């Protein structure tokens, strides 16, 4: 199975991620989020995506929980409240399908430490591809990749022609995470 970690985001991916980070920032300010990651995701595929699973290394979702679905061409948000020691560290997986109707999955993981430092920065990790790839997830492997991840990244699975891009930034007392789930065609 071929896949590629892209060298850089396309202009469209960067624009989408920036818009989602801004949406997360506005939501965080409005609800006065503290020690949290405010996550905003947009579905740029041609079908609705459904929530499959989540994993929490530190913290938990608050409020209405994870969005059960993300309709096509729309965005959804949630707040992941961090704990005082390690901040907000979690992941979500959404299922949908690619342009050929094949079942696919998109994974977004984030790390928003309580006290961001040069040695403990905000990080994101993303993955996508055939749905079967996400049937059994090694969360230890995802965490190891997240622990060395950058603040912005993107990934394309060439077999399924799916793509995902994400970014995280500190916004005072919380982190804003933006992600775009899409197709590479």
Swiss-Prot record:
Source superkingdom: Eukaryota
Any Pfam family hit: Nakanori
InterPro entries (alphabetical): Jasmonate-induced_protein, Nakanori
Family of the protein in this entry: Belongs to the jasmonate-induced protein family.
Protein name per its UniProtKB record: Jasmonate-induced protein homolog
Organism in which the protein naturally occurs: Atriplex canescens (Fourwing saltbush)
Lineage of origin: Eukaryota, Viridiplantae, Streptophyta, Embryophyta, Tracheophyta
């Amino acid at each position: 199975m071929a896949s590629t970690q892209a060298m850089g985001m396309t202009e469209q991916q960067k624009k989408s991620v920036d818009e989602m980070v801004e949406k997360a920032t506005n939501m965080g300010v409005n609800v006065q989020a503290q020690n949290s990651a405010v996550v905003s995701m947009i579905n740029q595929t041609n079908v609705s995506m459904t929530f499959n699973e989540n994993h929490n290394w530190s913290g938990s979702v608050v409020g209405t929980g994870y969005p059960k679905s993300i309709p096509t061409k729309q965005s959804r948000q949630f707040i992941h409240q961090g704990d005082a020691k390690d901040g907000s560290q979690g992941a979500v997986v959404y299922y949908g399908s690619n342009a050929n109707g094949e079942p696919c999955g998109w994974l977004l993981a984030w790390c928003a430490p309580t006290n961001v430092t040069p040695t403990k920065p905000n990080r994101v990790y993303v993955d996508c591809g055939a749905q079967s790839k996400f049937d059994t997830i090694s969360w230890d492997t995802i965490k190891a990749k997240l622990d060395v991840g950058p603040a912005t990244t993107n990934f394309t699975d060439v077999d399924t022609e799916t793509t995902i891009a994400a970014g995280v930034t500190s916004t005072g007392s919380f982190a804003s995470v933006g992600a775009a789930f899409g197709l590479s065609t």
